[in-house]
Amino acid sequence: NAIFSKKNFETLSEAFSVFQTLKYLAILGGVTFLAG
């Protein structure tokens, strides 16, 4: 059970990491759009 929880946590961290990257790219794109 502990192993499953750890694996589950890693999956969540990975998903959050991807989300953060997408959010950053979206903000960057928005700023570029406004500046352009």
UniProtKB/Swiss-Prot annotation:
GO biological process: protein glycosylation
Subcellular location: Endoplasmic reticulum; Endoplasmic reticulum membrane
Gene Ontology cellular component annotations, sorted alphabetically: endoplasmic reticulum membrane
Membrane topology according to the record: Multi-pass membrane protein
Tagged with keyword Transmembrane: yes
Pathway: Protein modification; protein glycosylation
Chief place where the protein resides: endoplasmic reticulum
Keyword rRNA-binding: no
Keywords of this entry: Endoplasmic reticulum, Membrane, Transmembrane
Subunit structure: Component of the oligosaccharyltransferase (OST) complex.
Primary role: Subunit of the oligosaccharyl transferase (OST) complex that catalyzes the initial transfer of a defined glycan (Glc(3)Man(9)GlcNAc(2) in eukaryotes) from the lipid carrier dolichol-pyrophosphate to an asparagine residue within an Asn-X-Ser/Thr consensus motif in nascent polypeptide chains, the first step in protein N-glycosylation. N-glycosylation occurs cotranslationally and the complex associates with the Sec61 complex at the channel-forming translocon complex that mediates protein translocation across the endoplasmic reticulum (ER). All subunits are required for a maximal enzyme activity.
Family as reported in the entry's similarity comment: Belongs to the SWP1 family.
The protein, known as: Dolichyl-diphosphooligosaccharide--protein glycosyltransferase subunit 2
Lineage start: Eukaryota, Metazoa, Chordata, Craniata, Vertebrata
